[in-house]
Amino acid sequence: MTIEPLNLVRIRRQFHESPELALKEFQTHALLLSVIRSLPQNLLEIKTIPELPTALLVRVAGSHPHRTIGYRADIDALPVNEKTGLDFASKTPGIMHACGHDIHMTVALGILEYFANHQPQDNLIFFFQPAEESHSGSVRAFNANIFTNQFRPNEFYGLHSTPTLPAGVIGCRMGTLFAGTTEVNLKLTGKGGHAAYPQDANDMVVAQAYLITQLQTIVARNVNPIEGGVLTLGKVSAGNVRNVIADQAVIEGTIRGLTQKMILLIQQRVQQICEGTAQAFNCQVEVKMNQGGYLPVENDPTLTHELIQFMQSDSAIKFKKTPPAMTGEDFGFLLSKFPGTMFWLGVGATSSLHSATFNPDERAIQLGIDAVIKFLQNRMSKGA
């Protein structure tokens, strides 16, 4: 039986026009399975996960394995109303592959296709992960014990598309590639009353304003200026009527840090300042902070050094050392469990990630596939 090579651009466009949100990627999962089952099956073992039904694991048996190498691709889309005007634009209003996960899946399928036809020396595990954008799919997968026995990787790799690099350029750095993130939700409760009689009430607008200014001292005065830390309070609300003193106020924000130590420091100071505000204003301040799986993506020093050296040494690969990004990625959770590396694939787009007009250059797909295949072959040649 002759098996036709994959039409990767066509597959990417199928993913793009049928985006699905986190934990709802059922059509995406079905298309992935269909493509994978069209490949030669003699080296492949496909594993589905009842506890995480849109996730998918595929194992490629190595010829003389010294290790098992994991490769992860995320599969979910974003709640963005696409405005690219492409012929293959999203057919689902309000949902779009605006973060390049359609590219990530397609690159992974291209790598998988190659090794399904050319047996690798080491075992390979391809993890198609749901719910990267929200709900921490990496945590859910790990907690479902999917990485066990022959599906347990010794090391993990993954890429993320970036419009800041030309199509096909690989970017990476030693240390942290993505910041860790924490959602911050604060609720202040006091005593409402008539605007004419403030002495009989406990105004939460005043307490809220004080708390906001105090929280902004954390990065200014508690964080080392040469280290990466951010606390942004992006949403506030209080009151309903101009002449009624508000009995409640809400603040929502996000913490970003390049190390987990930094994130924990900011979390601790948020808690302390909220407790102080509650005492100072004789009110209640409810503090909820959720990091989920969005730990800093801290690349393994040895594996990252090897990847950078290889990418720089191959004249067919264009490589650039990149600064850390303050955006989040839940691959950081997997790197807290397995050594590994994440790197960038340039897609040369003119619009930013998460933009309604994000339109990656499809030439990046094959260039990314070729670079990763070469790196994995080189990595496998090293032995144990």
Swiss-Prot record:
Its EC number is 3.5.1.47. It catalyses: N-acetyl-(2S,6S)-2,6-diaminopimelate + H2O = (2S,6S)-2,6-diaminopimelate + acetate. Pathway: Amino-acid biosynthesis; L-lysine biosynthesis via DAP pathway; LL-2,6-diaminopimelate from (S)-tetrahydrodipicolinate (acetylase route): step 3/3. The active site is at 74, 133 (proton acceptor). Coiled coil: none annotated. Gene3D superfamilies: 3.30.70.360, Zn peptidases. Catalyzes the conversion of N-acetyl-diaminopimelate to diaminopimelate and acetate. It comes from the Bacteria. PANTHER family: N-ACETYLDIAMINOPIMELATE DEACETYLASE (PTHR11014:SF98), PEPTIDASE M20 FAMILY MEMBER (PTHR11014). GO terms for molecular function: N-acetyldiaminopimelate deacetylase activity. One of its GO terms (biological process) is diaminopimelate biosynthetic process. It comes from Pediococcus pentosaceus (strain ATCC 25745 / CCUG 21536 / LMG 10740 / 183-1w). Keywords: Amino-acid biosynthesis, Diaminopimelate biosynthesis, Hydrolase, Lysine biosynthesis. SUPFAM superfamilies: Bacterial exopeptidase dimerisation domain, Zn-dependent exopeptidases. This is N-acetyldiaminopimelate deacetylase.
